[in-house]
Amino acid sequence: MQIYPLRLLPNKIDFDFMNFKKVSYTFSIILSLISFIWIGMYKFNFGIDFAGGIVIEVRLDQTPDLPKMRQVLGELGIGEVVLQNFGSERDLSIRFGSSSEDNLMKNIELIKSTLQNNFPYNFEYRKVDFVGPQVGRQLIEAGTMAMLFSFAAIMIYIWVRFEWYFGLGILIALVHDVILALGFMSITKLDFNLSTIAAVLTIIGYSVNDSVVIYDRIRENLRKYHKKGITEIINLSINETLSRTILTVVTTLLANLALVLFGGEAIRSFSVLVFFGIIAGTYSSIFISAPILTIFANKKFEK
């Protein structure tokens, strides 16, 4: 029995993507400017990881229902409340922000009374600590360094595997994706925390993977069609990989949609940002990183 590959599109596609490169450049520049302006005006909604807050360590007499506890505490109206296990399954860390010292004790007592009234557990409160913004600044610096190191590692990989102008194309696309992701976070007021740093790194990896698939086909077609110009080869390569690109993005979005809908508040910022980033990364790999090669490679291939 012969097995046929799954295809969402016909074998022969001849859509002129390169005809839209000026439109896509303009569109991306406008979106990037909007992101910069919005971030400058409204900043980010920093979560407890970066803004600081209160940490309560508590031990229970049995394994708690964490999703239910997150839901109940999230409805108190005191901002982000993060519950995590540490040590055993009966040890909990409860973190939340505090807008001022005046409501500090009030919010601590509110959390304690809410837990006591809604759950049939015995709570042993072991420690209450204040985490200052200095820790948040250190985490921001660590997150920034993680992104810079990922950029550097990706550039080294691309320059070793491809030509230098391929690396520039991917670098521009990645900067574009990160700017749009940060702008999206600022506009939607998603919590900026450690999980969103992980989401940005995930977006970077996804975008690079998409671009490398197209770049591989471009390199292959450059060897195969010596008489064709770089613009025609790029357009051909995008069309040849389009079915794979669409299949990948659809399956990835569907998997991530489950996290958005059912993952709960604990990973909401991560899942929503990754969902947006998959769309942005797919767009940039087709309309930014591939077409922009014509700027750097025209002189080499179209003499």
Swiss-Prot record:
What are this entry's molecular-function GO terms? protein-transporting ATPase activity
Instruction: Give TM regions.
Output: 28-48, 140-160, 164-184, 194-214, 246-266, 272-292
Quaternary structure and partners: Forms a complex with SecD. Part of the essential Sec protein translocation apparatus which comprises SecA, SecYEG and auxiliary proteins SecDF-YajC and YidC.
The processes (GO biological process) annotated in the record are: intracellular protein transmembrane transport; protein targeting; protein transport by the Sec complex
Q: Where in the cell is it found?
A: Cell inner membrane
Per UniProt, the keywords (alphabetical) are: Cell inner membrane, Cell membrane, Membrane, Protein transport, Translocation, Transmembrane, Transmembrane helix, Transport
Gene3D superfamilies recorded: Multidrug efflux transporter AcrB transmembrane domain (1.20.1640.10)
Cross-referenced PANTHER family: PROTEIN TRANSLOCASE SUBUNIT SECF (PTHR30081:SF8), PROTEIN-EXPORT MEMBRANE PROTEIN SEC (PTHR30081)
Question: What InterPro entries does this protein's entry cite?
Answer: SecD/SecF_arch_bac, SecD/SecF_bac, SecD/SecF_CS, SecD_SecF_C, SecD_SecF_C_bact, SecF_bac, SSD
* Protein family: Belongs to the SecD/SecF family. SecF subfamily.
Example GO CC term: the record gives: plasma membrane
The primary site where this protein sits is membrane
- What does the function comment of this entry state? Part of the Sec protein translocase complex. Interacts with the SecYEG preprotein conducting channel. SecDF uses the proton motive force (PMF) to complete protein translocation after the ATP-dependent function of SecA.
Q: How does it sit in the membrane?
A: Multi-pass membrane protein
Q: What is this protein called?
A: Protein translocase subunit SecF
